[in-house]
Amino acid sequence: MIPRWQPASIALLLHLDTLRCHHVSVRPPRATMTSLSIKEEDIPRLDGKVVVISGGASGIGLAAANIFARAGAKIFLFDRNPPDSGEAPENSTFIKADVTSWAELKAAFAQAGHVDIAVANAGVSEEQPYFEDTFDEQGELKEPGFAVVDVNFKGTVMFTKLAVSYMRKQGKGGSVVITASATGYAPEQNLPVYSAIKSGLVGLVRSLRSTLPRFDISINAVAPAATITKLLPMDIAGPLMAAGLPVSSAHMVGLAVVYSAVARQPRMVETYGKENMLDLESKWNGRTILTLGEHYTELEEKLADLRPVWFGWRNTDLTKKQQATADFR
């Protein structure tokens, strides 16, 4: 269940009262983020549902696959390498696919045949300090590698495009979940490009959350902070834990992924364009769940509610009017 919202701070309410005195029409933003309690027993049965997961052979993707499978879903694991022996659920199929290859992704989706839930999870970290100078044999500045861009952004966009295309053609709706990162909200200075791309994935969710529901398709993200996977093995996570800093298990993040695909919401994150019904019960959509240690926090609703504060009241009003003018739905 989503908890009751806490009241806004006194200072914020006074600010809103001042604006009302100047005849500015506002809806009071709610000032606190939303903590979530997610348990595997709350996940509904998914018998007959088909789930495709990129980067599904290990880490967060594999953890989500096992949870989906225990709920009765049929799983297709897209990855460059198969899962370790005995780790994949029985009702799963491994499909070799490189998410940077459109041809391989198309073939993987075609082999799956039907898609109800799609999890864009494949990702890599930065291979070297991106903005440090490295030189070739002639002493010239070397072109940097773009694996982190190709896998994390291009691969996610292509995977999402294929998933949405299949869901539209099927005419039965569906759910897309993207593995973003806490660095998309709180960048790491030693991972500048990775952080920027993860911020871009959150932006992709924001950009699509008003258009996909017309096809009964939802799109959400999960933003893991430090999580024990191949990208953050235990020998690196150990010192963080020893210092008392929160570290999540892959299972905990995987549970947030599954929840994002099946949950309901009592209201939209925000309205767009000509929309005027915010308090509309519907599929969980346009949201990001931060996983930090053993805690879950939904981030997007509060950011949207507080938009007039950080974006500016006049800017928010004019931008909304621009969106409505260009909204031809």
Curated annotation (Swiss-Prot):
Glycans are attached at N91. Keywords: Glycoprotein, Membrane, NADP, Oxidoreductase, Signal, Transmembrane, Transmembrane helix. The chain crosses the membrane at residues 238-258. Pathway: Sesquiterpene biosynthesis. It is a single-pass membrane protein. Induction: Expression and the subsequent production of PR-toxin take place under static culture conditions (oxygen limited), whereas no expression of the PR-toxin genes occurs under the strongly aerated conditions required for optimal penicillin production. There is a negative control of the transcription of the PR-toxin genes by the penicillin biosynthesis gene product(s), or by a regulatory peptide encoded by a small ORF inside the penicillin gene cluster. GO terms for molecular function: oxidoreductase activity. The active site is at Y194, K198. One of its GO terms (cellular component) is membrane. SUPFAM superfamilies: NAD(P)-binding Rossmann-fold domains. InterPro entries: NAD(P)-bd_dom_sf, SDR_fam. Residues 1-21 form the signal peptide. It is an enzyme of class 1 (oxidoreductase). Its main location: membrane. NADP(+) binds at S58, I60, N81, D98, N121, K161, Y194, K198, T229. It is found in: Membrane. Its EC number is 1.1.99.-. Belongs to the short-chain dehydrogenases/reductases (SDR) family. Short-chain dehydrogenase/reductase; part of the gene cluster that mediates the biosynthesis of PR-toxin, a bicyclic sesquiterpene belonging to the eremophilane class and acting as a mycotoxin. The first step of the pathway is catalyzed by the aristolochene synthase which performs the cyclization of trans,trans-farnesyl diphosphate (FPP) to the bicyclic sesquiterpene aristolochene. Following the formation of aristolochene, the non-oxygenated aristolochene is converted to the trioxygenated intermediate eremofortin B, via 7-epi-neopetasone. This is Short-chain dehydrogenase/reductase prx4. It comes from Penicillium rubens (strain ATCC 28089 / DSM 1075 / NRRL 1951 / Wisconsin 54-1255) (Penicillium chrysogenum).
